[in-house]
């Protein structure tokens, strides 16, 4: 493949095609959680090993936006998605970044669904702070555990809402 522009255009086109395909299927909350559990834990481990100081500051910046937001659900969800996407970028694995970008609309809706009934930014931020700290400390084992706990908490919310089979 050619230069950076061609690669970026190809990645964007691939992401768009996958987004369209996913919209045509009945994707459930359970599907999204299985996806998240399979890639976000590994990408967080890799981010703890590979993230540059600049990438860590980007992750931190998204968390600060979540903490300083006036607690509007839609903007908080966007910052939440950006937090997770920046971890994918910091993993150094371009496939993780592409998959997170591809899943953006579904992940955004997933975040909205899980936050909407009990919107408690402090609870969510607690998990995010721990994840960021483990990446900053360059501790992959603790990063894995922090993300695992975060996703387990999200999964519990979905089960409490009886939303496992809800399609997005």
Task: State where each predicted segment sits.
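Generic C-terminal helix-cap and adjacent flexible tail
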Residues: 141, 156-168
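Conserved amphipathic alpha-helical segments that form helical-bundle/coiled-coil interaction surfaces
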Residues: 32-113, 123-134, 142-156
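Glycine-centered secondary-structure boundary/capping sites
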Residues: 26, 73, 159-160
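Solvent-exposed loop and edge beta-strand segments that line ligand/cofactor-binding
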Residues: 116, 120
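Short linear motifs at protein or domain termini
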Residues: 1-35, 45, 164-168
């Amino acid at each position: 493949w050619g230069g950076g522009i061609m690669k970026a255009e190809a990645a964007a086109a691939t992401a768009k095609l996958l987004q369209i395909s996913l919209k045509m299927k009945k994707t459930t909350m359970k599907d999204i959680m299985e996806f998240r559990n399979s890639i976000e834990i590994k990408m967080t481990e890799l981010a703890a090993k590979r993230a540059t100081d600049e990438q860590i500051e980007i992750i931190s910046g998204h968390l600060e936006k979540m903490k300083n937001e006036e607690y509007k659900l839609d903007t908080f969800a966007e910052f939440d998605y950006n937090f997770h996407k920046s971890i994918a970028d910091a993993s150094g694995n371009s496939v993780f970044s592409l998959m997170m970008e591809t899943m953006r609309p579904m992940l955004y809706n997933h975040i909205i669904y899980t936050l909407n009934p009990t919107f408690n930014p402090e609870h969510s931020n607690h998990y995010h702070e721990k994840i960021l700290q483990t990446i900053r400390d360059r501790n992959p084992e603790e990063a894995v555990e922090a993300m695992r706990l975060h996703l387990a908490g999200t999964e519990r919310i979905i089960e409490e809402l009886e939303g496992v089979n809800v399609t997005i």
